[in-house]
Amino acid sequence: HETDPDGHVLNSLMLIVMKFQREFSNLKDAFMTVHKARSFGSGSERLYVTNKEVGNFEGLGEICRQAGGRIPSPQLKNQNKAFANVLERHNKEAYLVVGNSANFTNWAEGQPKKADGTCVKADTHGLWHSTSCDDNLLVVCEFYFIL
């Protein structure tokens, strides 16, 4: 190019881009190390985290979305165990979402009972129960990272 006949500007820009690529790669590696360490103990790629507050089902969805997560929806036994570990630590129950095509369920004996409510909660053992959507339960959000 006429304003940069020797390509110095282009070379400088290429060096800057390469530096950002290295920094991004390092950041991604660090993030994945933390994620793997957090999920190591539970054997689940999904993280279940509480802010130690309580709330109803409607409020939970918004809280989880704002935090970058979602309402828990364990799809495998190890995910349900990781979720139950949080509940056991805090000795509280929490809401979860059961998908229509769920291959995994963990209903307590005699459940689900629509008469008990249209939402689902997990107890400290990870067993699922029908419940009212207005109950104030422990706020737990699910975070699932795909890189």
Curated annotation (Swiss-Prot):
Gene Ontology molecular-function annotations: carbohydrate binding; phospholipase A2 inhibitor activity
Glycosylation sites: 103
GO cellular component: extracellular region
Keywords: Disulfide bond, Glycoprotein, Lectin, Phospholipase A2 inhibitor, Secreted
Localization (cell): Secreted
Disulfide bond found in the keyword field: yes
Major localisation: secreted
C-type lectin domain location: 62-143
Pfam families linked to this entry: Lectin_C
Cited InterPro entries: C-type_lectin-like, C-type_lectin-like/link_sf, C-type_lectin_CS, CTDL_fold
PTM info: Glycosylated.
Disulfide bonds: 64-141, 119-133
Tissue expression notes: Expressed by the liver.
Function of the molecule: Inhibits the enzymatic activity of the acidic phospholipase A2 (PLA2).
Subunit structure as annotated in this protein's UniProt entry: Homotrimer; non-covalently linked.
Stated family: Belongs to the alpha-type phospholipase A2 inhibitor family.
UniProt name for this protein: Phospholipase A2 inhibitor subunit A
Native source organism of the sequence: Gloydius brevicaudus siniticus (Chinese mamushi)
